[in-house]
């Protein structure tokens, strides 16, 4: 009985380790949750963030235009 309980504990610990590793990869997802958009006077495509008042930080956005209630953010 003790061996079976120990085996269950080992399997549970391994499952927790692999689940935590998978969550770390999910934090650094290679895609943005934004749709493509275009602003007048801008030749490139921007990122449309829905129901946001400002562009989110960490993506290198330098300019934007409002498309109420959304915002189109440009990285250049």
From Swiss-Prot:
It is found in: Secreted; Nematocyst. Disulfide bonds join 37-72, 39-65, 55-73. InterPro entries: BDS_K_chnl_tox, Myo_ane_neurotoxin_sf. Residues 20-31 form a propeptide. GO terms for cellular component: extracellular region; nematocyst. Residues 1-19 form the signal peptide. Blocks Kv3 voltage-gated potassium channels. Reduces blood pressure. Belongs to the sea anemone type 3 (BDS) potassium channel toxin family. This is Kappa-actitoxin-Avd4c. It comes from Anemonia viridis (Snakelocks anemone).
């Amino acid at each position: 009985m003790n061996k079976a309980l120990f085996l269950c504990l080992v399997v549970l610990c391994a499952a927790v380790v692999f689940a935590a590793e998978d969550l770390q990869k999910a934090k650094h997802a290679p895609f943005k949750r934004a749709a493509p958009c275009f602003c007048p006077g801008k030749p490139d495509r921007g990122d449309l963030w829905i129901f946001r008042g400002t562009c989110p930080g960490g993506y290198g956005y330098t300019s934007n235009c409002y498309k109420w209630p959304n915002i189109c953010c440009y990285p250049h």
